[in-house]
């Protein structure tokens, strides 16, 4: 802390010197405040370090919301928006997550794609899905880490791929330190993986385990090319060295799955080292975003076409030469997911998969069991609150009720106001 002390009687100084002395005092004060601001910038922690203190939980989000003015305009502004988009998605605030992602310029590639999708032919994914699964032994799909839409979509691939001999599900979220996940068959918060603490991702892994997949970590330390190369090496070591004829799914973030020669991404290194040409499909750029769903070029080419289909479903994009489009993206195909429709303000339609249903939490229930505002997490009673919840939601004091997306079964609800926990049990029938 910097203090500048003024002489309380400085106005009584020699009048000829008074004006110049005031200027000196002002300059001293300005310099002190500037220096103090610089010190504060240097003392400001990386937002990921701040969030880690509370396990990247609701409490982390609440703390960082109150620090918004410190991070905006600082050297940590972009990672702040990046992390906030992830944390908002974990508590069911998907619109806020998208807005934070847009502030962090994480959608820049989508603008470029919108300008190039002028002569695109689209067909339902269901017409080619069987062929993709049957004619490949390695399929790589991707996501944007703040958007669970792709995770819900990938769940729909698991059963059909398993029926065609795929036995491993590799994901970059998984930590190698959780070596017992395949035996335990549950996802531990903060232990199994980072992104998988989000309910839909947790359910993706839970579903894969229930079907019979073996979960495989492949994340690597480091940055840039070394990280990409090491990720490919980990896939080889953790799967192919043990099962040379294996068929498997790989789920990664954004461009890491690209297998285009010369791009130095994980998918390309894997192809080069193994001779296996994986089928790589971008499932990230054409997913939910308020800003980009309103763009005329995207709406006309994709979302309106899907809305006009008898059954709204994902579509695959081809160019006028009937090649899977985009053929210059470094991936084999782009998949466009249907326009998001919110059933309730906090429940997107893609969240009700695998027989999930809406369960209402009203103010009367909250008053009896929880806090006026906070976050509620719904854990399977058979798993307990150390595991990733089936759903969770951050609610405000003015919300009369809200919905959770839950399966039939018994649940442990945990209410958190940022300082304490309260618990209740429910049965969804």
What are these model-predicted stretches?
Residues 1-46:
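Bacterial Sec-dependent N-terminal signal peptides
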Residues 41-429:
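Compositional signal for N-terminal targeting/processing segments
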């Amino acid at each position: 802390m910097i203090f500048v002390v003024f002489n309380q009687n400085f106005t009584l100084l020699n009048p000829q010197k008074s004006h110049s002395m005031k200027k000196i005092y002002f300059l001293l004060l300005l310099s002190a405040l500037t220096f103090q601001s610089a010190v504060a910038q240097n003392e400001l922690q990386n937002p990921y370090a701040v969030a880690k203190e509370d396990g990247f939980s609701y409490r982390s989000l609440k703390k960082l919301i109150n620090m918004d003015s410190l991070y905006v305009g600082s050297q940590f502004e972009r990672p702040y928006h990046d992390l906030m988009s992830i944390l908002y998605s974990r508590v069911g605030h998907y619109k806020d997550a998208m807005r934070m992602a847009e502030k962090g310029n994480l959608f820049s590639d989508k603008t470029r794609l919108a300008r190039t999708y002028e002569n695109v032919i689209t067909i339902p994914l269901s017409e080619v899905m069987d062929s993709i699964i049957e004619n490949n032994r390695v399929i790589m799909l991707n996501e944007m880490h703040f958007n669970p839409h792709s995770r819900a979509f990938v769940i729909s691939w698991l059963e059909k791929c398993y029926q065609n001999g795929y036995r491993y599900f590799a994901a970059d979220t998984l930590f190698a330190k959780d070596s017992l996940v395949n035996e335990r068959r549950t996802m531990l918060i903060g232990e199994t993986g980072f992104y998988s603490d989000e309910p839909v991702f947790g359910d993706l892994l839970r579903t894969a385990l229930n079907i019979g997949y073996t979960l495989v970590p492949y994340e690597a330390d480091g940055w840039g090319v070394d990280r990409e190369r090491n990720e490919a090496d980990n896939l080889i070591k953790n799967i192919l060295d043990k099962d040379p004829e294996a068929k498997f799914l790989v789920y990664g973030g954004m461009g890491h799955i690209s297998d285009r020669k010369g791009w130095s991404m994980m998918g390309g290194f894997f192809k080069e080292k193994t001779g296996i040409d994986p089928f790589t499909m971008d499932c990230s750029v054409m997913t939910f975003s308020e800003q980009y769903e309103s763009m005329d070029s995207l709406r006309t080419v994709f979302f309106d076409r899907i809305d006009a289909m008898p059954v709204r479903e994902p579509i695959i994009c081809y160019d006028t030469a009937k090649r899977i489009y985009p053929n210059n993206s470094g991936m084999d195909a782009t998949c466009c997911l249907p326009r998001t429709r919110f059933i309730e303000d906090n429940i997107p339609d893609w969240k009700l998969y695998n027989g999930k249903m809406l369960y209402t939490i009203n103010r009367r229930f909250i008053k009896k069991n929880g806090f006026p505002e906070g976050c509620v997490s719904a854990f399977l009673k058979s798993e307990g609150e150390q595991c990733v919840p089936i759903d969770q939601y951050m609610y405000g004091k003015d919300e009369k009720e809200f919905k959770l997306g839950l399966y039939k079964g018994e649940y442990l609800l945990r209410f958190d106001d940022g300082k304490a926990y309260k618990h209740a049990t429910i049965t969804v029938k």
